[in-house]
A protein has these predicted regions:
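Predominantly a Rossmann-like dinucleotide-binding segment in NAD(P)-dependent oxidoreductases
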Residues: 119-193, 198-201
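Conserved SAM-binding strand-loop segment of SAM-dependent methyltransferases
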Residues: 46-53
Length: 325
């Protein structure tokens, strides 16, 4: 199989490394308008690059494309790839105004579309989803990290999270909602508070407190921000017969044994793959697992865990939360 990775920034290079690790037989080429990025990928990963997508498609003749550019450009790139007959894998999308046309084009061209939703491939999320099944629970969840610490090697003003249309809080909401809905159920009511509490040079709220009512009776409080100086994900779930804790890392999942009155650690990983440039709650395992899932999807072995149809509804929900007064 031949794969084109479009966008050779941090996510594109991560995907190349993990594709090489997943299946060394996959042929890879890259696309990026920045010569320095193409050269870095050539030097570090042995991957040739193009500066033009059309030329890359014509000359490399790929079977599939990984779209790893800024989310604001995903739509145009995805449509060009689909119209050229390529299966596509997109990183998280923060705009859904192109979804209907893409789904229609994919059907016409007999192409497959796969959307990254990395947390659905975390083993802890799989465990939590099963643990709360058929229970009525409440949960409290905080997901936050100070925006300048996201990419310490560059200014936050230099990438998409500073753009109001694809802002940092919108991204985190779009990352978290797919697994929150899969685990706790369809959302039927939402109430939110938001404000700007920092001196960050952004024109959007930097924190949200969101109350969620789920169709099955579950309720949650979701606190999301780009303020917390210690990047963290912290979840507490409780019911009459369950008390569960998770701090976003593979080592931090535990349940309370109410008979012995002590926390029991839940270890789900034989090996954890970590990139130390990122916060402790970001691990490589799930990124690789969703690449495997994409390849399996292309081979007819498994279906995506998150669809564009589902994601369209989630992005509409995020827009509603952003627009609430």
């Amino acid at each position: 199989m031949k794969v084109l990775v479009i966008g050779l920034g941090s996510m594109g290079t991560r995907r190349i490394r993990l594709i090489q690790k997943t299946d060394p037989n996959v042929e890879i080429a890259g696309v990026d308008t920045q010569e320095s990025r193409r050269q870095k990928v050539k030097d570090e990963l042995g991957i040739d690059g193009f500066d033009d997508l059309r030329q890359a498609i014509d000359d490399f003749t790929p079977d599939a494309a990984f779209i790893c550019t800024s989310p604001i450009s995903h739509g145009a790139i995805a449509l060009q790839c689909l119209k050229s007959g390529l299966n596509i894998f997109t990183e998280i999308n923060l705009l859904n105004d192109w979804y209907d046309e893409a789904l229609k084009t994919a059907k016409e061209k007999n192409c497959k579309m796969f959307l990254s939703s990395t947390f659905l491939y975390r083993k802890e999320i799989e465990y939590i989803t099963k643990a709360v099944e058929n229970k009525k629970v409440n949960y409290i969840y905080h997901s936050g990290q100070y925006l300048p610490d996201w990419h310490p090697w560059e200014s936050y003003k230099n990438f998409f999270v500073s753009d109001k249309r694809t802002n940092a809080c919108r991204e985190i909401l779009a990352i978290e909602f797919p697994w929150l809905i899969k685990a706790f159920g369809e959302i039927t009511d939402v109430y939110s508070l938001k404000s700007k509490n920092t001196s960050l040079d952004v024109d959007f709220p930097d924190n949200y407190i969101i109350v969620l009512q789920h169709k099955n009776g579950n309720k949650g409080v979701f606190c999301q921000d780009i303020i917390a100086r210690k990047g963290e994900r912290k979840l507490e779930v409780y019911a009459e017969d369950l008390h569960l804790f998770w701090e976003g890392t593979p080592q931090s999942l535990s349940v309370y044994d109410f008979n012995d009155r002590k926390d029991i650690s839940i270890n789900l990983y034989d090996d954890v793959n970590k990139d130390n440039r990122y916060a402790a709650n970001i691990i490589e395992n799930a990124y690789q697992d969703e690449i495997k899932a994409f390849f399996n999807y292309l081979n007819g072995i498994e279906a995506p865990r998150h669809t564009f149809e589902e994601d369209g509804k989630i992005l509409d929900l995020v827009s509603k939360i952003e627009g609430e007064e």
